[in-house]
Amino acid sequence: MTKKKEVLREIGMIARCLDSISNVEFQHLNLSRGQYLYLYRICENPGIIPNQLAELIKVDRTTAARAISKLEADGFVVKQSAMGNKKNKLLYPTDDGLEAWDFIRREGVHSDQVTLEGLTEEEIETAVHLLRRMRHNIEVDWKFVKKGGRRPYMDQSE
């Protein structure tokens, strides 16, 4: 296996491990799979609009809308019309949402400690720097495909 493939496989495995743990540990909060991501970002950014939230989490608007509707129905967030633009709905956490967020943040701190165990500050800085560069690289394609574009490999014959 090439080192290039190993990088994304390792990132994927780390992400799936953390997501799986979170989904189990957040069951008592009555959060459905992956909803904690949305709630966390809404609590971090009170008043965020759904399109900005979708962009922040890197999901399509329809997926974000479903998750937001479920969070709203379950009493974790509320939507309010923006002043001067009634179409824009601002998202705010409820008291229940803030209470859940407190638990989610504690899990995040613990997961950070476990995941980064044995790494020096310099290694962590290097990892963050490299991962940001990788994200910036793929965001170009993500935005292009999101707007209906086709990446070049799709037009090549096998």
Show where each model-derived region lies.
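C-terminal regulatory/oligomerization modules of transcriptional regulators
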Residues: 121-158
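Charged, amphipathic alpha-helical coiled-coil/dimerization segments
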Residues: 69-132
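Hydrophobic structural patches
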Residues: 11, 39-42, 131
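Alpha-helical linker/hinge and terminal dimerization helices associated
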Residues: 11-14, 18-21, 57, 100, ...
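Membrane-interacting alpha-helical segments
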Residues: 4, 60-61, 90-93, 147-158
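N-terminal helix-turn-helix DNA-binding core of bacterial DNA-binding proteins
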Residues: 16, 20-63, 146
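N-terminal leader segment of winged-helix/HTH proteins
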Residues: 1-29, 157-158
